Amino acid sequence: MSRVCQVTGKRPAVGNNRSHAKNATKRRFLPNLQTHRFWVESEKRFVKLRLTAKGMRIIDKKGIDAVLVEIRARGENV
């Protein structure tokens, strides 16, 4: 399973670890992914999403129904 937020689309970024001597070694910055079940009243069922903490705040703001419309418009099955 890929490390991509289903709401925001955030994915791992690539950067460097920097030592005290300024040596650079490659590293990945991973998104803060959580798996969360949301109750969708209009469908009378739970929907399981893999999303970041920011994605959860977006759902709090817009509502689960509006976010599901956006996700389905991109062609993802939910």
From Swiss-Prot:
GO terms for biological process: translation. It holds the Pfam family Ribosomal_L28. PANTHER family: 39S RIBOSOMAL PROTEIN L28, MITOCHONDRIAL, LARGE RIBOSOMAL SUBUNIT PROTEIN BL28M. One of its GO terms (molecular function) is structural constituent of ribosome. This is Large ribosomal subunit protein bL28. It comes from Vibrio cholerae serotype O1 (strain ATCC 39315 / El Tor Inaba N16961). Belongs to the bacterial ribosomal protein bL28 family. NCBIfam families: L28. Residues 1-25 are annotated as: Disordered. It comes from the Bacteria. HAMAP family: Ribosomal_bL28. The gene is rpmB.
